[in-house]
Structure formats: structure tokens, C-alpha cells
Amino acid sequence: MAAPQCHALVHRVLAECPVTKARACEFRLPHGPVKTPVFMPVGTQGTMKGVTADQLRNLGCEICLGNTYHLGMRPGPEIMKKAGGLHGFMNWGRNLLTDSGGFQMVSLVELSKVTEEGVQFRSPYDGKEILLTPEKSIEIQNALGSDIMMQLDDVVSSTITGPRVEEAMHRSIRWLDRCIAANSNPDRQNLFAIIQGGLDAELRRKCLQEMTKRDVPGFAIGGLSGGEEKDHFWRMVTLSTDHLPRDKPRYLMGVGYATDLVVCVALGCDMFDCVFPTRTARFGSALVPWGSLQLKNKQFAKDFQPIDKNCDCPTCQRYSRAYINALFKSDTAAMHHITIHNIAYQLNLMRSVRDSILQGRFPQFVQDFMRTMYSSRDKYPQWAVDALETVGITLQ
């Protein structure tokens, strides 16, 4: 067991919803404060697709996510060190979270073989064999200089059952200890543990019991959002938040749909990330409080309203739906404008959620959000109805 460390993260709970498990917190990191609940946009190779660091800053983003697997391959840790870490490389003066590279074990499974030592990859760039160990993952993340680093965990698809899930859970605990020992900057870089256990409540409980014994500054709920039934998903989320310490951040990995964000805040989660808002923008889909608009469709060719008249993002302040629709015929700028809007939508949604918690009206916020998103009670997803019921919100 590692000795207690001096962490670079100071966490405060500012308000808790008296009905649900929702909470508004603030934690201070080396590159400034982060107010939660928070959505973190994802930049795979040190940049948001179609958005500059300045634009992200202007949207009020306090923390974004970089991918260790891709950045470790190209441009690589040596170049990162010379650039002054990932902050210097992408000219980003705010906070960064880097993942461990473990998720690619699922998404690039044909490239990988898992042993106790680590994950054997064939590089998609040059075909070379690479062994990503817990130590190597932390070495790369130390070179990147991220404010929050994730442990390397043994990731299996959330739809898999049986002995492989138990093996992955126990291995993730052992790998956490190796990651803690390998972190050369604990006073500047915060290492988060990742709770595994698949959809097996007993395994997840065991993992929670073991990992919460470790002196780490925060915890992530991993191994979900991979195609499992939503009914299983929310039950594993609530089981996890029930057993995680109150005084540390709780990060639900890979969640980005608006309804999922609101429900999982009610279940006690603080931090979220997902490629969804940027990926869906590339297909012409703009996020709005009542769902999404497919701006490529010809119905928008003569629609001179902004995407959302209540949105204060640069896209909605300057351009019409018709203009963006026209851009799709000849220009990639359409995707850029929608990406800006979609990131702003996610950040604004989480600010509204937070304000409602601070003002003691979160349950009413949830009622209003669901009514706007789905127009009628019979369209509410049953999993969301059931999940909210368990934390004291009966949807009207």
C-alpha cells in the first residue's frame, strides 16, 4: 500500500441536492479551478477536431481531455517534453485530463493482447509491436504534464460476462498500485483510479472496496457506456456512487448524451467526457434542448433562425441554419460552426445543472429538462424514469 501523498487537487463540496445524490463541487488543479458537474470535450491528438484552444477557452471550458495512446504514438513523449508538455504543445493554459490508453484495448482489440505485464499493441501508424505497461502509460502521461492522469486499467467490453471480467477487475487493482508507484509528479499530477467489474454488482463492489483503500485524489467509473442495456448501465453507476468517498471527484467515463448527463448527475457523478458532441457535428447534427437538428436536410435551406435562439455561442450569434446548410455543399466550415455550438451546448447544460443544484431547485430542473427534451411523458426513456425514481424524482 502506497504511503499517503500530497495531492495537487483540492476538492470542496459546495452544495448537495437534499432530494437526489446530485452535488455541486469545485476542485483546484495546477491550471486553475474546475466547477462541477462538468463536461470535458475530447481532443484525441492534442486538439479538438475543428476547434482551436482559443475558441475552447472563449466557450468557458475549464478542462479538456487528451488521448495518451495516440499522443504516445505520435508525436511521442520526447517531442511533448520539448514543447513544454501537452499544455505548451496545444497552447492550452487551462486543465487537461489524459486517459491511460486502456480504452483502445476495446476499440482496437484486433491490435492488442493483454498479459499481466501490460497491453501488447501493433502500432496502427507503422505496424511496430509496442508494450503499454502501467509504468509506460504513466511515463507518457508524466511527459504530457496533464493535471489529471488515469491509471492503465484492463478494459473489457461492457457486454462481456464471465471469468474475463473478474480477471480484468483484479488486474486493474494490481495495475493501479503499479501506476501509483510509477507517478514521478504526484504533487503536480493527480492520478485517478478506475472502477471496473463490468455489469456484475458483486465484482464492482469488490473493486470499489479495494480501490477506495488507495490514497488517490479521485475515482472514475469505467467499463460502461459500451453498448450495454441502459437499465444495467444506470444500476452500475448508482452502485458505484453509493460506495465512492464524498470528498473526492467522481468521473463517469464516456458519457455525453444530454439525458445521460442529467440523470447521472442525479445519481451522484461529477465529471463526464465523450466524443459525441464533436463526432455528431461532423454529420451535420446540432444539439438543442429538444433533441437535435440535422442541418444538412433541405428543410433548413430557407430557415434564417439561429440553431437555438437562446444559445450565446458564436455560431448562434452570427449564423443562420440556412447559412450552415448552404456551407455543407462546398465547405468544411459547416462542421466547424456546429462543433463550436455543440461544445457550447454541453458546457451550458452543465452550468445550468450546477446553478440549479446551488439554488436548491435541481429536481425541478430535471422535470423541466425532460419535458423540453421529450415533449410528452410517454416518450421518456423508461431507464431514466426508473433511475430518477430511485433518487426521489418522480417524473411528471
UniProtKB/Swiss-Prot annotation:
It is found in: Cytoplasm; Mitochondrion outer membrane. It is an enzyme of class 2 (transferase). It is a peripheral membrane protein. Transmembrane segments: none annotated. Zn(2+) binds at residues 311, 313, 316, 341. PANTHER family: QUEUINE TRNA-RIBOSYLTRANSFERASE CATALYTIC SUBUNIT 1. Heterodimer of a catalytic subunit qtrt1 and an accessory subunit qtrt2. This is Queuine tRNA-ribosyltransferase catalytic subunit 1. It comes from Xenopus tropicalis (Western clawed frog).
